[in-house]
């Protein structure tokens, strides 16, 4: 589960 606000593309 990834945390809220995780942006790998960012």
Curated annotation (Swiss-Prot):
Family as reported in the entry's similarity comment: Belongs to the bradykinin-related peptide family.
Keyword Secreted recorded: yes
Gene Ontology CC terms, in alphabetical order: extracellular region
Gene Ontology molecular-function annotations: toxin activity
BP-aspect Gene Ontology terms: vasodilation
Domain of life where this protein originates: Eukaryota
Record keywords, A-Z: G-protein coupled receptor impairing toxin, Secreted, Toxin, Vasoactive, Vasodilator
Role according to the record: Smooth muscle contraction. Probably plays a role for this system in cardiovascular regulation in fish. May target bradykinin receptors (BDKRB).
Main localization category: secreted
UniProt-recorded name of the protein: Lysyl-bradykinin-like
Tissue and organ distribution: Plasma.
Species of provenance: Oncorhynchus mykiss (Rainbow trout)
Location of this chain's protein in the cell: Secreted
């Amino acid at each position: 589960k990834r945390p809220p606000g995780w942006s790998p593309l960012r």
